[in-house]
UniProtKB/Swiss-Prot annotation:
GO terms for biological process: defense response to Gram-negative bacterium; defense response to Gram-positive bacterium; digestion; killing of cells of another organism. This is Lysozyme C-3. Monomer. PANTHER family: LYSOZYME C. Lysozymes have primarily a bacteriolytic function; those in tissues and body fluids are associated with the monocyte-macrophage system and enhance the activity of immunoagents. It catalyses: Hydrolysis of (1->4)-beta-linkages between N-acetylmuramic acid and N-acetyl-D-glucosamine residues in a peptidoglycan and between N-acetyl-D-glucosamine residues in chitodextrins. Stomach-specific. Transmembrane segments: none annotated. It comes from Bos taurus. GO terms for molecular function: lysozyme activity. It holds the Pfam family Lys. Lysozyme C is capable of both hydrolysis and transglycosylation; it also shows a slight esterase activity. It acts rapidly on both peptide-substituted and unsubstituted peptidoglycan, and slowly on chitin oligosaccharides. The ruminant gastric lysozymes, which digest symbiotic bacteria coming with cud from the rumen, are much more resistant to inactivation by pepsin than are other lysozymes.
Amino acid sequence: MKALIILGFLFLSVAVQGKVFERCELARTLKKLGLDGYKGVSLANWLCLTKWESSYNTKATNYNPSSESTDYGIFQINSKWWCNDGKTPNAVDGCHVSCSELMENDIAKAVACAKHIVSEQGITAWVAWKSHCRDHDVSSYVQGCTL
Protein backbone atom coordinates (compact mmCIF):
# COMPACT_ATOMS: atom_id res chain seq x y z
CA MET A 1 0.00 0.00 0.00
CA LYS A 2 2.82 2.41 0.89
CA ALA A 3 4.44 1.66 -2.46
CA LEU A 4 1.24 2.63 -4.29
CA ILE A 5 1.01 5.92 -2.39
CA ILE A 6 4.65 6.74 -3.12
CA LEU A 7 4.15 5.82 -6.78
CA GLY A 8 1.08 8.07 -6.90
CA PHE A 9 3.06 11.03 -5.54
CA LEU A 10 5.81 10.35 -8.05
CA PHE A 11 3.36 10.48 -10.96
CA LEU A 12 1.75 13.61 -9.52
CA SER A 13 5.10 15.40 -9.25
CA VAL A 14 5.93 14.53 -12.86
CA ALA A 15 2.55 15.86 -14.02
CA VAL A 16 2.98 19.10 -12.06
CA GLN A 17 6.57 19.64 -13.26
CA GLY A 18 5.73 19.32 -16.92
CA LYS A 19 8.36 18.99 -19.57
CA VAL A 20 11.66 20.81 -19.31
CA PHE A 21 13.14 20.75 -22.78
CA GLU A 22 16.81 20.21 -23.46
CA ARG A 23 18.08 23.19 -25.49
CA CYS A 24 18.71 21.37 -28.79
CA GLU A 25 15.51 19.33 -28.45
CA LEU A 26 13.57 22.58 -28.14
CA ALA A 27 15.45 24.09 -31.09
CA ARG A 28 14.44 21.13 -33.27
CA THR A 29 10.83 21.31 -32.05
CA LEU A 30 10.53 25.06 -32.65
CA LYS A 31 12.04 24.66 -36.12
CA LYS A 32 9.62 21.83 -36.93
CA LEU A 33 6.72 24.04 -35.79
CA GLY A 34 7.82 26.85 -38.10
CA LEU A 35 9.37 29.40 -35.75
CA ASP A 36 12.81 29.60 -37.38
CA GLY A 37 12.75 32.93 -39.21
CA TYR A 38 9.06 33.53 -38.47
CA LYS A 39 8.38 37.27 -38.86
CA GLY A 40 12.14 37.74 -39.16
CA VAL A 41 12.92 36.25 -35.73
CA SER A 42 15.76 33.72 -35.76
CA LEU A 43 15.56 30.36 -34.02
CA ALA A 44 18.41 31.49 -31.74
CA ASN A 45 16.32 34.45 -30.58
CA TRP A 46 13.34 32.18 -29.79
CA LEU A 47 15.66 29.90 -27.80
CA CYS A 48 17.09 32.87 -25.90
CA LEU A 49 13.57 34.13 -25.18
CA THR A 50 12.33 30.78 -23.86
CA LYS A 51 15.49 30.26 -21.78
CA TRP A 52 14.98 33.54 -19.94
CA GLU A 53 11.17 33.37 -19.78
CA SER A 54 10.74 29.79 -18.54
CA SER A 55 14.08 27.94 -18.52
CA TYR A 56 12.49 25.79 -21.27
CA ASN A 57 9.79 24.59 -18.82
CA THR A 58 6.29 24.00 -20.23
CA LYS A 59 4.67 24.32 -16.79
CA ALA A 60 6.28 27.62 -15.78
CA THR A 61 3.91 30.23 -14.32
CA ASN A 62 4.46 33.71 -12.96
CA TYR A 63 1.78 35.78 -11.22
CA ASN A 64 1.78 39.55 -11.85
CA PRO A 65 0.05 41.24 -8.89
CA SER A 66 -0.14 44.68 -10.52
CA SER A 67 -2.31 43.43 -13.40
CA GLU A 68 -3.80 40.45 -11.53
CA SER A 69 -2.65 38.30 -14.45
CA THR A 70 -0.43 35.26 -14.85
CA ASP A 71 2.19 34.32 -17.45
CA TYR A 72 1.92 30.70 -18.64
CA GLY A 73 4.10 28.08 -20.24
CA ILE A 74 7.37 27.96 -22.11
CA PHE A 75 6.79 31.41 -23.67
CA GLN A 76 5.23 32.92 -20.51
CA ILE A 77 2.13 34.07 -22.36
CA ASN A 78 0.02 36.51 -20.35
CA SER A 79 -3.57 35.84 -19.29
CA LYS A 80 -4.54 39.53 -19.43
CA TRP A 81 -4.03 39.72 -23.19
CA TRP A 82 -3.52 36.35 -24.82
CA CYS A 83 -5.12 33.37 -23.04
CA ASN A 84 -8.10 32.57 -20.82
CA ASP A 85 -7.44 31.27 -17.32
CA GLY A 86 -10.95 32.00 -16.04
CA LYS A 87 -9.71 34.28 -13.26
CA THR A 88 -7.94 37.29 -14.79
CA PRO A 89 -10.18 40.38 -14.68
CA ASN A 90 -11.06 41.94 -18.07
CA ALA A 91 -9.00 39.38 -20.00
CA VAL A 92 -8.85 39.79 -23.80
CA ASP A 93 -7.91 36.19 -24.83
CA GLY A 94 -6.21 37.32 -28.06
CA CYS A 95 -5.07 33.79 -28.96
CA HIS A 96 -8.47 32.22 -28.19
CA VAL A 97 -6.83 29.51 -26.10
CA SER A 98 -7.07 28.26 -22.54
CA CYS A 99 -3.98 29.20 -20.54
CA SER A 100 -3.73 25.58 -19.37
CA GLU A 101 -3.26 24.51 -23.01
CA LEU A 102 -0.15 26.72 -23.13
CA MET A 103 1.41 24.49 -20.46
CA GLU A 104 1.00 21.20 -22.30
CA ASN A 105 4.09 19.14 -23.10
CA ASP A 106 3.04 19.33 -26.76
CA ILE A 107 3.87 22.99 -27.36
CA ALA A 108 2.04 23.36 -30.70
CA LYS A 109 -0.69 25.60 -29.21
CA ALA A 110 1.87 27.68 -27.33
CA VAL A 111 3.84 28.14 -30.57
CA ALA A 112 0.66 29.12 -32.45
CA CYS A 113 -0.06 31.77 -29.81
CA ALA A 114 3.56 33.00 -29.85
CA LYS A 115 3.27 33.38 -33.64
CA HIS A 116 0.10 35.43 -33.16
CA ILE A 117 1.79 37.66 -30.58
CA VAL A 118 4.91 38.26 -32.67
CA SER A 119 2.70 38.99 -35.70
CA GLU A 120 0.82 41.67 -33.77
CA GLN A 121 3.49 43.16 -31.51
CA GLY A 122 6.85 41.84 -32.60
CA ILE A 123 9.40 40.02 -30.47
CA THR A 124 9.65 43.08 -28.19
CA ALA A 125 6.34 41.99 -26.63
CA TRP A 126 8.54 39.80 -24.39
CA VAL A 127 10.37 41.72 -21.66
CA ALA A 128 12.91 38.91 -21.20
CA TRP A 129 13.87 39.15 -24.88
CA LYS A 130 14.43 42.90 -24.54
CA SER A 131 16.47 42.43 -21.36
CA HIS A 132 18.57 39.38 -22.27
CA CYS A 133 18.55 38.79 -26.03
CA ARG A 134 18.22 42.07 -27.92
CA ASP A 135 21.60 43.41 -29.08
CA HIS A 136 23.34 40.23 -27.84
CA ASP A 137 25.03 37.46 -29.77
CA VAL A 138 22.45 34.70 -29.37
CA SER A 139 24.15 32.19 -31.69
CA SER A 140 25.25 30.07 -28.72
CA TYR A 141 21.61 29.07 -28.14
CA VAL A 142 21.64 26.92 -31.28
CA GLN A 143 25.35 26.11 -31.35
CA GLY A 144 26.03 22.38 -31.52
CA CYS A 145 22.41 21.50 -32.30
CA THR A 146 21.70 19.23 -35.25
CA LEU A 147 18.83 21.02 -36.94
